[in-house]
């Protein structure tokens, strides 16, 4: 999608449709005011007569726009000015572009950058505008025999007030477009059925990403023979009941001037289907366990975004992928497995398999001497009980890293909530038969899952994002959300800014 930024009078812009946000209090925003003057108070009259109610998310298409360069206007309600925050703007954007996606339009223009949203600047508003456009145009219909017509939108022009705003808008739109593409890839991988999206399929997707990266991405695939030689028995144990072989996928992007600069590493849980194994899940809703690889999908999506933005830091994406199935060879409750780190783990419930593939991946990445490691996983139902479907759970062994991730989530409006990782919880993992058990009972399930992972992440700053409640939606809108690509991308961009400030200047 193209995203030109212009400073022209909105009344003169030639476009198939001009999207105009309107507050409920009747005071028009600067762009809408200019349009109103040029069209003999078209917008004002609609509001005065009650023909358009600018409640939050309400939209109305005006098919003819006399006196204006635009062929059509799309009015979108912002609700009350005093209540307009980030969530309200994003809801209005989703409503506007949801309507646009249903129309036969190739190009539109929008004036959302003049909407006041707290202390958010033009760059942020441009970013979320592009993200919303990509979100609305996303379709997953490759298994539909007669798919609906795809949205035609290919160009979104952002209208701003002056050149200073234009520079900010261009920067924000570039990030928003890249995040939008990364989110779309994440959603597609998550939405694919388990008989298509297998560990081998994910490995192929990594190679495909590298093939289109002009040498910017190096990929290494560790198959089961390599994993066995390595000693990654926890990862292998999860997949040993499946006909689908497990994989460890490593994607390396070296964007820093020094290729040996400590990388930031993302580790994704890639359980391409989770039946629960011998500890079999209930049948109702088991189809949604294809989404148990959404952590891995978010790593793919973030790496795609990184390739689009080319930050000057080193980033490594690692995906630990397996299929968890019941079989005569499958792991059983009571089994003890020796991990890559050398710790012996007692398996108490085979449906707690994500932490097993992750623990070996966390041990593996130690060889890169990372600046930070963030793992992303649909790990615990307890995270949904604690946080619902709005915030991802965040736990970390490093308070500075946790704060950086929280800040990134607030900036990207892809938020997380910090939970404690206190030593007092560790005793719940005590085992009579092994070095530790891999689950700690019902109390504090999200925390004890992170406690388990922390045993394998003690050599570097590490954080864990539990996205069980945010990775996908159920019901009529069932599908992968693409989260937390926005948070992860912002975290990496912030690390690029931080690195630029600390690198010695060259004279």
From Swiss-Prot:
Keyword Hydrolase appears in the UniProt entry: yes
Family per record: Belongs to the peptidase M17 family.
Pfam families xref list: Peptidase_M17, Peptidase_M17_N
Binding sites annotated in the UniProt record for Mn(2+) 1: 274, 351, 353
GO molecular function terms listed in the Swiss-Prot or TrEMBL record: manganese ion binding; metalloaminopeptidase activity
Catalytic function, reaction form: Release of an N-terminal amino acid, Xaa-|-Yaa-, in which Xaa is preferably Leu, but may be other amino acids including Pro although not Arg or Lys, and Yaa may be Pro. Amino acid amides and methyl esters are also readily hydrolyzed, but rates on arylamides are exceedingly low; Release of an N-terminal amino acid, preferentially leucine, but not glutamic or aspartic acids
Entry's Gene Ontology cellular component terms: cytoplasm
Gene: pepA
Subcellular location, record wording: Cytoplasm
Entry-linked InterPro entries: Leucine_aapep/pepB, Macro_dom-like, Peptidase_M17_C, Peptidase_M17_leu_NH2_pept, Peptidase_M17_N
Cofactor requirements of the protein: Mn(2+)
Major subcellular site: cytoplasm
SUPFAM superfamilies per UniProt: Macro domain-like (SSF52949), Zn-dependent exopeptidases (SSF53187)
UniProtKB keywords: Aminopeptidase, Cytoplasm, Hydrolase, Manganese, Metal-binding, Protease
Role: Presumably involved in the processing and regular turnover of intracellular proteins. Catalyzes the removal of unsubstituted N-terminal amino acids from various peptides.
Native organism: Chromohalobacter salexigens (strain ATCC BAA-138 / DSM 3043 / CIP 106854 / NCIMB 13768 / 1H11)
Catalytic site positions: 281, 355
Any one Gene Ontology BP term: proteolysis
Binding annotation for Mn(2+) 2: 269, 274, 292, 353
Principal EC category: hydrolase
Protein name: Probable cytosol aminopeptidase
E.C. number: 3.4.11.1, 3.4.11.10
Cofactor note: Binds 2 manganese ions per subunit.
């Amino acid at each position: 999608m193209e995203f030109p930024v212009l400073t022209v009078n909105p009344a003169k812009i030639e476009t198939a449709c001009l999207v105009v946000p309107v507050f409920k209090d009747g005071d028009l925003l600067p762009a809408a005011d200019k349009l109103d003057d040029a069209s003999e108070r078209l917008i004002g009259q609609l509001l005065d007569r009650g023909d358009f109610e600018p409640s939050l998310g309400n939209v109305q298409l005006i098919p003819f726009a006399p006196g204006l360069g635009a062929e059509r206007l799309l009015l979108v309600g912002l609700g009350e000015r005093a209540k307009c925050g980030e969530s309200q703007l994003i809801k209005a954007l989703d409503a506007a572009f949801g309507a646009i996606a249903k129309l036969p339009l190739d190009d539109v223009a929008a004036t959302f950058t003049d909407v006041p949203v707290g202390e958010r600047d033009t760059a942020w508003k441009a970013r979320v505008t592009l993200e919303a456009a990509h979100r609305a145009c996303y379709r997953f219909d490759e298994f539909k025999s007669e798919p609906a017509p795809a949205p035609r939108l290919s160009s979104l022009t952002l209208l701003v007030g002056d050149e200073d705003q234009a520079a900010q808008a261009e920067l924000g739109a570039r990030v928003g477009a890249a995040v939008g593409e990364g989110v779309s890839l994440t959603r597609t991988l998550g939405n694919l059925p388990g008989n298509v999206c297998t560990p081998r399929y994910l490995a192929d997707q990594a190679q495909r990403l590298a093939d289109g990266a002009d040498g910017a991405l190096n990929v290494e695939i560790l198959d089961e023979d390599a994993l066995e030689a390595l000693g990654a028995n926890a990862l292998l144990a999860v997949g040993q009941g499946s006909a689908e072989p497990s994989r460890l996928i490593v994607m390396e992007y070296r964007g820093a001037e020094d290729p040996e600069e400590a990388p930031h590493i993302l580790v994704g849980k890639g359980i391409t289907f989770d039946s629960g194994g011998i500890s079999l899940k209930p049948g109702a809703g088991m189809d949604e366990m294809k989404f148990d690889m959404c952590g891995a999908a978010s790593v793919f999506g973030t790496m795609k975004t990184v390739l689009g933005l080319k930050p000057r830091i080193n980033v490594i994406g690692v995906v630990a992928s397996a299929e968890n199935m019941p079989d005569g060879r499958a792991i059983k409750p009571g089994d003890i497995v020796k991990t890559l780190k050398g710790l012996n783990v007692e398996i108490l419930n085979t449906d707690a398999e994500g932490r097993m593939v992750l623990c070996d991946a966390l041990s593996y990445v130690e060889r890169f001497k990372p600046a930070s490691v963030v793992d992303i996983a649909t790990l615990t139902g307890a995270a949904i009980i604690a946080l619902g479907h709005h915030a991802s759970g965040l736990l970390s062994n490093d308070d500075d890293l946790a704060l950086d991730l929280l800040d990134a989530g607030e900036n990207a409006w892809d938020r997380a909530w910090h939970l404690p990782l206190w030593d007092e919880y560790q005793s719940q993992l005590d085992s009579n038969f092994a070095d530790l058990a891999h689950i700690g009972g019902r109390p504090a399930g999200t925390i004890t899952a992170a406690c388990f992972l922390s045993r394998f992440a003690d050599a570097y700053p590490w954080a864990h994002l539990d996205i069980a409640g945010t990775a996908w939606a159920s019901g009529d809108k069932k599908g992968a959300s693409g989260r937390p690509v926005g948070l992860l991308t912002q975290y990496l961009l912030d690390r690029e800014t931080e690195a630029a400030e600390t690198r010695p200047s060259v004279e």
